Amino acid sequence: MRINGETKLTGIIGYPLKHTLSPQMHNEAFKALNLNFLYLPLEVAEESLPQAIYGLKAFNFRGINVTIPYKEKVFPFLDEVATEAKTIGAVNTIVHDRGRLIGYNTDAPGFLLSLKENDVEVTGKKVLLLGAGGAARAVAYALLTAGAELIIANRTIDKAKELAKDFQGVGKISEILELGDKPISLAPYHMAVNTLPLGMHPYENQMPAVDFTGVTSDFVAYDLIYNPAETKFLKASKEKGARTINGLSMLLWQGVLAFEKWTGVSPPVKVMKKAIGLSC
């Protein structure tokens, strides 16, 4: 990879970034297309976030990804936010265009592309969304726009109600459930999506309180976590014969869309898959 005065800079801002796979995914794609671009991990403490975002203009970055915990916090520092990102309430991709920083959300369409890749149809289907935080918002928006009937389960009912209120004009949210000690039956649903940190470090031995009784091979278990590749939730689902998808697929497709926005060209998807350990 060549780096010179004409190299266009991209990257990811978040905290922490120790386990991010995005740099290797994007840099391998740049290399494959012989593009003079570089993708950097930019670990930024919260008190330095304003300077970091404004610095994108100073250092003439072409764009960046935004990850936890800043997807909602970057809004005040942007010149423009795309309508979809405003509705979702989160920005995960920023494009620097002629001195203006424009915020987008590629998580939602990336999630839908991951469903398409895995031949999962959600139109008219009942989907259980586990969680109502920042990660859940993009998934909820994606599912609702695809015509799914959404049921939201969260430990804090008020937060689930807030999400439902924000998206009441987007699609059908038919029920809000309390995610507590009493397990929620998965049997009535076509798919369940875990957006909670239960299953990732340091909660590897935990999963949402759900009951797998009645789950069949038609059921789809989706976990946004990709490290570990198989969470306790996915493992239990697989043991019941269900189809399972981890977060690598969404990571890939949101990255594909961000890549296109920065470069104006379609990335080599197979190269990106290989870079993050996804089978082609």
UniProtKB/Swiss-Prot annotation:
The active site is at K71 (proton acceptor). Disulfide bonds: none annotated. NADP(+) binds at G131, A132, G133, G134, A135, N154, R155, T156, I157, D158, K159, L224, G247. Shikimate binds at T20, L21, S22, T67, N92, D107, Y226. One of its GO terms (biological process) is amino acid biosynthetic process. Its EC number is 1.1.1.25. Pathway: Metabolic intermediate biosynthesis; chorismate biosynthesis; chorismate from D-erythrose 4-phosphate and phosphoenolpyruvate: step 4/7. InterPro entries: Aminoacid_DH-like_N_sf, NAD(P)-bd_dom_sf, SDH_C, Shikimate_DH, Shikimate_DH-bd_N, Shikimate_DH_fam, Shikm_DH/Glu-tRNA_Rdtase. Transmembrane segments: none annotated. The keyword Nucleotide-binding does not apply. The keyword Oxidoreductase applies. Belongs to the shikimate dehydrogenase family. Involved in the biosynthesis of the chorismate, which leads to the biosynthesis of aromatic amino acids. Catalyzes the reversible NADPH linked reduction of 3-dehydroshikimate (DHSA) to yield shikimate (SA). NCBIfam families: aroE, PRK00258.2-2, PRK00258.3-3. Homodimer. This is Shikimate dehydrogenase (NADP(+)). It comes from Carboxydothermus hydrogenoformans (strain ATCC BAA-161 / DSM 6008 / Z-2901). The gene is aroE.
